[in-house]
Structures are given as C-alpha cells and as structure tokens.
Design a protein with these regions (language model features):
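Well-ordered beta-sheet/strand-loop patches within structured domains
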Residues: 40-43, 96
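Paired acidic/hydrophobic, glycine-rich loop segments that form the ligand-binding mouth/hinge
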Residues: 45-46, 65
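Short, charged beta-turn/beta-strand-edge "cap" motif at the junction between a beta-strand
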Residues: 51-53
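Short secondary-structure boundary micro-motifs
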Residues: 29, 47-49
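Aromatic- and glycine-rich peptidoglycan recognition patches
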Residues: 24-25, 57-60, 65-117
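Catalytic cysteine-centered active-site loop
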Residues: 1-41
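A generic structural signal for residues embedded in beta-strands
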Residues: 46-47, 73
Length: 117
C-alpha cells in the first residue's frame, strides 16, 4: 500500500509534476494558499495529528483536495473524508488531523499548460 506522500507523489507524476518524497518536503513546493476557501481541486493540504498540541506543528500527513469540503488521502488505503479549516473529519465528525497549510501546486501546473499552448 501507499503512504500519504507516496500517494500524492504518484498522482502528481501523472501530470508531469515531480514531488519530493515525504510530506515535509512536499510542503516546500508550490505556493501557499491563504485559506481552504481559496484552495483549488488538486491543491495539497498538510496536517499534524489531532491528538498533538496544535501549536507544536509537526507535519505528518498530506492529502489532495477534491474541493474545499472533501479530501482524498492515504494511510494504508485511500480515503475520501470531509475537510474544514480545522482539518480532516471522519464521517462521525471525529477530527483526525489538524490542518496546518495548503500548497497550490495546480496553479503551477495550469500556468505551465498555458505556456505550452
């Protein structure tokens, strides 16, 4: 199975975008998106675990935004869950990961496609 960053790396490789291997490294690629409301489908969202102190950021998870309410991510198997400004929520509402940052990689991809026309 995939881990979270291996999953995002594989998805982006289909579009010719080479992501670094782990979530912390992937967070350095692309442009910071100010809020979930401004994010585009395909942007990457980065998280720490919900059971940790939210002020002690330790990036441990990454997922791919489907829209500003759903995220696809992988932890042994692929999941589609709800996301909000707090983070990832299971169907029962349990918060599993705190949202730390969103990186807009689709902006770069779209620009490159426009330049190649």
């Amino acid at each position: 199975g995939y881990d979270c960053s291996g999953f995002t790396q594989t998805v982006y490789s289909v579009f010719g975008i080479n992501l670094l291997r782990n979530a912390r490294e992937q967070m350095t690629q692309g442009e910071v998106v100010a809020s979930l409301a401004e994010a585009q489908p395909g942007d990457l969202a980065f998280f720490d675990h919900a059971d940790r102190d939210p002020k002690a950021t330790n990036i441990s998870h990454v997922g791919l935004l489907l829209d500003n309410q759903k995220i696809i991510h992988c932890s042994g198997k692929v999941h589609i869950d709800m996301i909000d400004e707090q983070g990832i929520h299971l169907a029962d509402g349990e918060l599993t990961h705190h949202l730390v940052q969103i990186i807009g990689l689709m902006i770069r991809y779209q620009r490159s496609q426009q330049l190649n026309r």
